[in-house]
Amino acid sequence: MYYCISFTHKNTDIALREKLSFSNEAKKSEFLKIISTHENIEECLVISTCNRVEIVAFVKMACAEFIVKSLALLCDVDKDILLEKADIFEDSGAIHHLFSVASSLDSLVVGETQIAGQLKDAFAFAVKNNFCGVHLSRAVHSAFKCAAKVRNETQISKNSISVASVAVAKAKELADLTQKKAVVIGAGEMGELVAKHLIAAGAKVIILNRDLQKAKDLCERLGVLSEYDSLENLKKYLNQYEFFFSATNAPNAIITNSLIEELSYKRYFFDIAVPRDIDINENENISVFAVDDLEIVVQKNLALREQEARMAYGIIGRETSEFFRYLNDLALMPIIKAIRLQAKEYADKQLEIALKKGYLKKSDKEEARKLIHQVFKAFLHTPTVNLKHLQGKMQSDTVINAMRYVFDLQNNLEGLNQYKCEFDMENNDEIY
């Protein structure tokens, strides 16, 4: 069954989320290796963003305690606290949750579009490292399909906002950004989003990054209203400008009290990284805003999009039901094919016996074959129709198992394509 353990802005604070975050691929790989050793876990992947850590798996039976214990040991967190905080979803609940995440209905900023790319990256990593198989491939592929439907059939992502845009909107409430210089620390996806929103607000941006070439490349994309420098010169910039937006993947804080000098004017720090980049004391001239502090702006966004969200949840509910109908169809179609194949094999075998014993002339072989095939097709028509009527119904599994036993189809099914998955697990072909 499908299984999901979720830690988000809804059930954990930023301090706990930053402990749980997978800031590098090595940590993610280590965790997935640990949990994939469990006998009940067949496939798994991890989605880790500034607002969530999601463990999505395909399992034989529930195993939340093992997964949470493994996460607690790796991240040095109390297991009981995690079990108390975790939202756990099983089977249809897990698929509904995954579809909601992919469609940005479960995001801190409803309608933001970053999560689709983050899910894509999480899936690609799991496939590349052999943690993900056909079951999660189906689920993620369907999640992308659902997200596309939500985007196309609702206005949920129209004028969509992100954590980056919310941070800049908050800065605009504090001061006029026109012609001001704002420092953006980090040249990754989030840093680029912040820079674009700042430029749109009339500001000029300075990109600081450890990899100078990456900062230069970003500035070339941004245009004349940007400049760049090395992160080594961070202290100089911290004590020269008013607005700072930090979005790095650093494992520990990079802006600390030791870098801050007392100045006569106000400075505003926006920390949109998890783990947090900023660990400084606030005073009358220094204000720090972390991801969770942007909740007020987010709530305004939710109110504006409430009607669209209801429509989107309707789509997600229907797509969840459709997904499980699809799974039932995959199970039924091989049964129908196997029965027809078995009938054809028996008919051909008896035809050859009849020819050998002289019951039938060789010249009549093809006509006899056509007649026999028409007979077994007519005979199997009603069973085939009845099986197809079971598609998507609860009793389908019971009937499938009975048919497999009655017709001894276990071996016959091995050669058939039971999955019809558009993702080739051997060649790592993309489905997104």
From Swiss-Prot:
Site keyed Important for activity: positions: H97
One GO MF term: glutamyl-tRNA reductase activity
Binding site for NADP(+): G186, A187, G188, E189, M190, G191
Pathway, per record: Porphyrin-containing compound metabolism; protoporphyrin-IX biosynthesis; 5-aminolevulinate from L-glutamyl-tRNA(Glu): step 1/2
The UniProt record lists the keyword Protein biosynthesis: no
Keywords: NADP, Oxidoreductase, Porphyrin biosynthesis
Active site per UniProt: C50
Entry keyword annotation includes NADP: yes
Enzyme class: oxidoreductase
EC number per UniProt: 1.2.1.70
Residue sites binding substrate per the record: T49, C50, N51, R52, S107, E112, T113, Q114, Q118
UniProt catalytic activity: (S)-4-amino-5-oxopentanoate + tRNA(Glu) + NADP(+) = L-glutamyl-tRNA(Glu) + NADPH + H(+)
Sequence similarity: Belongs to the glutamyl-tRNA reductase family.
Quaternary structure and partners: Homodimer.
Other comments on record: During catalysis, the active site Cys acts as a nucleophile attacking the alpha-carbonyl group of tRNA-bound glutamate with the formation of a thioester intermediate between enzyme and glutamate, and the concomitant release of tRNA(Glu). The thioester intermediate is finally reduced by direct hydride transfer from NADPH, to form the product GSA.
Protein name: Glutamyl-tRNA reductase
